[in-house]
C-alpha cells in the first residue's frame, strides 16, 4: 500500500513494536519514501545482530542508532520517544460502586493527526486483501488489529463509505454489528462536546466527513472509527467455519456440531445454513470419514445420513463410551451434562456478560396457558411440576426422564441383587429379549435387540411382524433429520421380558422400521424393566502361544484408511461351512468380535478330500501394505544337502501362522463380516487376532518369528544341517543318535513357544522323506508327482497352461530342453480368449513326445562336497539348456532352461557368456562353491572368430573365463545324453577365417532366370546352369544350393559375388544367426552346409578385370548364364572386356568382342580410345585395394563446406573431412586424414575435377605409391558408390543439425561418419581387419634426430584435436591426432610436439598461394 513496506515484522522485533515504528515513520515531513522503510528494516537487523536481543522501546532509543548510517531512522526513533513519553496519565476516579480498572501504560502509539496527510483514494482489491491477510488470525480490537488499520487509514485517508467497505471485508457479521453499535455510541457521546468543525444542522458526522474538504473532521471520524474497534466487548474467539477441520481424535458427530456452531456465529441471520453444512461436513472431514462416505455414495447426501453412516466410526484415541455404571459395590453418581458453550457477547436484555439471554434473570415469563397436564395445577408449567421431579426410575410411567439415572440411592443392596442384570458389550450393547403379541411372526419369540439409552421409543423391524398389522404413519426426528416415510406406529399391545419366566411388561404402541434395519430397546422399555444396566469385565480370549509380543513392523505402520469391501452373498451350503469355520476359529482364539471400521470379504473353499478351508480375500489390504523382504530367497535346493549326512527327519507345524499375534491398531485391516441367512438378523463382524493366511507379509513375519528358535537349535547341533521353509522343517544329521536327540530337543523347544508339531506328518529315513513336493533319498532327490502329458490336439487354453505350469515346476529336475518348451509356449501367442481351443502342429506334438521321454528321468544327485562342480551349456536357436553336475555322479545336480531375452540376433559367444554367468550365480547361491569347468557345444573356430572380430565390451568378461571353458562337441559325457538327440544347425561346420589350402572351391552366381556354379580343384571339376525363379537374388541362391549339392562332403572354399549371400554366410560364420528362417529355401542351405567339416566364405567382384585365378573363375561362372542378347551380357559383366571375350553363344562367335563396348555409351565416355588403363572402371577385391573419391558441398549457416569423401570399393568403409576452401592443398589434407583412418590404398579412382587432375595432387600420389585413375562423374557403373555415400553423409549431417542447430561442423561430421561406418554397414563387414587398422608408420622418437627428407612437408590437422567432447569412430584417430606426415621414403610420422625442432615447409605452388594461411 503506497510507500509502506509489508506489515510483517522482520527478525528481531515484535509485531506491535514494528507497527509503532511504521506509524512513527508516517509523521516524517516530507512523507517517507521506500528508502526510509528500507533503512528502518536495516536498522532493526543491525540492532538485533549487534545487541544479541530483540528491539524494544526501552532498549532501542534514539541513542542506539549511529548518526548518518541509517538515514532518517534517528528522527523516527525521536518522534516515537516523544509521543510515548507525553502520553496521558491514568484515568480519574470512577463511580464509587465500581472499582476503577488497573492502569497499564499504553503499548500502542496514540492516534495523531499531525503531519501532511495523503490524498484520499479508494481502496484497491489488492490493498484490502493485504490488510485482511495481516489481521486474519488476530482478535478484533487487539493491538496489531488497531495499528494495522491505523496505518492503512493514514495512507489512504478513507471516507466513511470506504471504512464501511473495509469493515465488511475484514470482519464477521457479528463483529460488524458490535462495531457499528460501539461507533454509534461513540459519535453520540463526542458530537456535542469535543468534535471540532461539526455542525449538526449540516447533517450527520458521517455525511459531513464524506465531503472532499472535510479536513480535520474526517480525521476525527477515523479516530472514532478506530476507537470503536478498541471498545468492542471482549468475547472468546470463535473459530471461523472456513478453517474447521476434523481433528484426529474427534468423532464425526462432534466435528459436525462444532461446524454448526461456527456457522451460526459467522453467517448473517436469514442465510440458509443447510446447503453450506452439507458440503462442509464432507469437505473438511478427515480422510477416514471421507472414504466411508465415498464408499457408501453419501458425498452429496444430507447431514443426517452422513452422521448415520459415520456413527460407528470412532477416533483411534477415543475412550469407550460413558457407562451408566461399572461393576463394583457402589454405582457412580449421575452423569454430568456437557458444559454449555459461553455466550459470544453480552445479554441483549440486561447488557451484562456471562449468561445467555434465555437465562437472563430479568426475563419475565408469563403464566402457563393452561393447567399442568400431570397434576392439573394451573400455577406452574409442566417442566416445573413437583410430581414429575419426584418420580423415580423404579416407578416407571409415561413421563420417564431423558437419561437413565443411577438407582443406587433409591434401592438397597438387597433390592439391587433382585434386579435383572443387562450385560452390555463395549462396542454394540445388545441383550436377548423375549417377545409375545398378536402381530408377531411365530418365529420371532426371541431376538437380540440393541440397547440404546438415547432412543425414546423401542423399534422393531417390519419383517418380524405379520403383513396386516395395524399401522399409522410416524414422523421421527433423528440425527439425520425428520423421517416421514420410513417408520410406522404399531397400534397394538406388545409384551417383552428379559427372562422366559418374566417379569413381563406391556407396551401399548411401538415404532416399526419398514427398512428392516433396526431393532432397538429404547427408554420406554428400559424405564419399566426394573433391571440393572452394567458392563461386565472383559473376558480375554485364550493366550495363543508364548509368542505374545506382536511384531513391531508389519508394513501398515503408515496407517492407511482400512478397506471397506462389501461381503458378497453366499449360498446356504457355503454359508453353513463358513459359520462352522468361524466358530472353530473363535473357540481357538484366532479371531474375536469386532465393531470397528474395515472389511474384507470371506468365503469357504472345498478341498479335494471334501473338507472346507477358510479363505479371507485380503487383496485390498495387500495393496495398501508395504512389502517386507523375506529372509530366504525362495524354496531351498534340496540337492544342496550333502551326501555325508544320510539321516533325515521332517517336521510339520500345525496352524503355524496362527501363533503370531497382531496389534489392535492393525486389526481393522483384517476385519470381515459373517453374513446371516437371508439377512434376517444383524451380521456379525470379526477381526483376526493373529497373522491371517493371505496377508502379503505373513510368510516374512513368520520366518522372522521362527528364525531365532531355529538358530538356537542349529547352534546346539553344529555338525548337522537344518533346512526350513515356512512351516516345514527338515533336519539332516550324520548319525542316528544325533538325529534323535536333535528331534526331541527341537520339538520340545517349539512346543514351549506355542507351536504345535504334527506328529502324524513326521517322516524319517531309511524310507524317502517327502519335503516341499519332493522326495529326499540317500543319494538323490526326486519329485513326488510328475505331470501326465496325455495331450491331444485340439486342447483348451486352460489345460495347456496347467501342463506348462507343471512342467516349469519339474524342469529343474528333469532333462527337459528348451526347444520343445519353446514350441508349446509359441502356441500361446496372440490368444486372448480364455475359452480358446488350440490346435497343435505336428512339430509341437513331436515336442510333447520329447518332453514325455525327458520326464522319465526323474532324478537328481545330491551334492558331494569332495568333488568339484562342473557345468554344461547347450545352446540352441530356441534358448539355452544349462546343466550342473559332478564327476562320478549318477545324475546331474540341476537343469536350467533360459529363453532368449529378446527377438534380436545375438552372437553364440554372448549367449555362452550369459549361460556361464547364470550357472555361476546358481552354484554360489545353492552350493556356496564356484564352478571348475564349463563345457559347451560350440565349435572352437566359430567361438574364436567371434572373440577376435566382435567389438562387444563383454568379450573381456568371456576372456576371463577362457581357461575354464572347453568345447565338448554335441555329445558330452554324462547322464544327459538325451539332451542332444540331433545336431543343431551352424554348430557342426568348422568355419575358417582364411582360405583353406588345397581344398575344393565353389563359385556361384545367378541372374533373373538362371543360376550357375562351378567346382574347381587344380582344374575344373564340374559346372552347371540351373533354372531359377523370377528374381536375381533367388537365382544366386539357387546356384549356391546346386553347387553345395554337387560338392562332396569335404572342406570347401565358397566364393560368391553377391553381397547378400556373402553377408548371410558371414553371419553364419560368426554364429550370430538366431532369427527364424525368413525364406524356406534357407533350410536346404543349412542342411547342405552341415555336410562339410570346414568351410571358408569369400567375396569376389564380378566386374573385376584382375588377372588372378579367382576373378577368372568367377568370370567363367558368368559365361554359364546364357542370355538372349549381347547387351544383357554386357550389362551383367559391367564392361569387362575379358568376360566379353568369352561370350559363349556360338551364333555370334564371329562378332567382334569389342562390339558391345562400342555400342555402349558409358564405355565410350570412359574409354574413348579403347585401351586407356587410366580410365578403366575397377573395384577392389580386398581392403585398401581401390578407393573412390569425390568432393561434394554442404551449406551450414553462412558457410559452404567442401566435403572430401573417400570410399573403399571393397567394404564400403568411408572417411570424409570438411574444408572451408577448395584447393589442391585441402584435397591433399583430406586424403592424408583418410589414410590415418583407413590405411594407404593401392589405387585411387576419382572424377576429372581440377583438384584431382592437378600436378601437385598427381605428384603427391606418385610419392606415396598410389595409382591414380579417373572416371566420368555420375556414371551408374562407376561413381555410383561414392555418390550414394555423399547423399547418405549429407542426410546424416542434416539430421544432426536439425536435432542440435548449433552443433559444430566437425562434431556433426564425426557423428555422421560414426553412424555410417558403425550402424549402416553390416556387422559381418566390421571385423578388425576390415575396419582398416593398418600397421602404424614408424614414429620418430623424441631423443633421435629429425629425418631429412623431401623439401615438401604436408601438414594436416585432424578434427577433434582441440575438442575434448568429440567422439570419433575409432581409437586410431586419438592415437594419431596431433601429428604430421613427412614425405620421405618410407613416409614417417612426426609428433606435433617435435615440429618446432625444424622448419615446416609447405607447398609453394601458385594454386596454393591464396590459401597459404589455412594450411597446416
From Swiss-Prot:
Residues 586-776 form the Reverse transcriptase domain. Its cofactor is Mg(2+). InterPro entries: D_retro_matrix, DNA/RNA_pol_sf, Gag_p24_C, Integrase_C_retrovir, Integrase_cat-core, Peptidase_A2_cat, Peptidase_aspartic_dom_sf, Retropepsins. One of its GO terms (cellular component) is viral nucleocapsid. SMART domains: ZnF_C2HC. The active site is at 452 (protease). A motif (PPXY motif) lies at residues 100-103. This is Gag-Pro-Pol polyprotein. It comes from Bovine leukemia virus (isolate Australian).
